[in-house]
Amino acid sequence: MKRWTALGRAVAMAAILLCGAVAQAEPTDNCAVPSYMLLGDNALDHVHAAVEKNKTFEIVALGGISSTLPGPDGATFGYPARLQAALSRLLPSVKVNVSVVTQPRQTAEQMVDGIGQLLLDHKPSLVVWQTGTYDAVHGTDPEEFRSAVAEGVEKIKEGGADVVLVNMQYSPRTESVVAMSAYADAFRWVSREHEVPVFDRLAIMRYWYDQGQFDLYKATKDMKIAKSVHECLGQALGTMIVDAAHLAAPEGTPPRQ
């Protein structure tokens, strides 16, 4: 029990690192991501049809505590809000709305139970489903985790929406404490088998850290880093979605091969 308490503290601290800024987020030059991390072959056909026909784009961001920042205006600076801003810039003729549904301290299996009602309530073209951290902390069997994610993906698709999976966030402080690799592999498996995109937040944040774009150790003392990380995640996710939906070629995006 003490072991899980320590793990929970470590992951909670990692979430706080990236949820500490409450100042206005602005675009940053540190957002560079290799194109191979964002561009893939799995298409978002429902998104394409909805945007082309209705010029509206309804998204639900389903996730845990790392979806938003603390404080009364914290939701404004989390990556879902930054995603809405990014998509509005990329698709200026489209009305974009991102609703955030936060379900903290839930496993993927628990989150699946609420997907049907979520689809009825919001009628989205796209669900951005962030999961994995709580399962990793509590040692869910990776095969059971994979099965739960696959079930959730099928529910979303059967409900008439597309899905983008978002995996765990990277923190150098928890890297040696919580084993994430098996869960990252599960995301990749579901992506291949069910032909859905994965926004590899774990690899992207690790890349930024390794390249010195963000000092995620320093984030414990300099919480302003959090707003920049969320801004960059929103921009990168927006680029990935626009590409997967074949809506436009964002400026600076290399041509698809």
Where are these regions (language model features)?
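Serine-esterase "nucleophile elbow" of acetyl-processing enzymes
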Residues: T28-V100, I115-K123
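Bacterial N-terminal signal peptides that target proteins for export
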Residues: M1-A12
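Bacterial N-terminal signal peptides
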Residues: A10-G20
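Cell-envelope and extracellular/periplasmic
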Residues: D29-P34, V100-Q106, V128-V137, R192
